[in-house]
Amino acid sequence: SRKVRSINYFSDKLELWHPDKKFNSVLVLGEQGIGDEIMYSSLISDLIDTKIKVGLFMDRRLKGLLSRSLGNHEFIDNQEEAIRKGYSSYIPLASLCKFFRNSKDDFNKNSFYFRSNKSILKKLITNYKSQKPRIGISWHTESLSHGTQRNIKLSKLIHLLRNENIDFINLQYGDHGTEINRLSKKLKRDIFLNDSIDNKNDIDGLCAKISACDVVIS
């Protein structure tokens, strides 16, 4: 995969970052999928706290979200650019766990959280109009290794979705139009509030949608 090739590329050209070594900069390599990069992002804030220059070689869809949440750290577009920029070390993102997550207290000490785009959030809330409680729902992952444990048919949530005192927001990525339309016909109304956000590619928009929710079911 691209992520494995990147790790192999940088391991031949840069030293592996370690807190006991005096590096002046480090390139953080995203690994696995975008969901894992989001899950491990709080580790980057711990790395930044060590006062080292941090560059990010991660999924470009996260640039806006991470720039707002972590500060404007450099996003690197390709391997050669990282070498030209003179980074002195590299580390795969999840490998930061062994330095910054060794006890429950380490999790409690970290105060990192994602910041949604306020402009997008304001437009969404204006567009949604209703004052009903808003519940965001996602129900499917494309993960081959964990999909069977984490997926559910949308129809299994019909007891919840039939409640007309709640507004539902679609947080699901991918093409699930047929499934949504089938259930909408059964309930004789649109299940989800309308918006134009691409949940797979517009991560800033998706983050704003989550922020607009009172509750999220995932």
Q: For each predicted feature, which ranges?
A:
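Catalytic machinery of carbohydrate-active enzymes
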Residues: 1-218
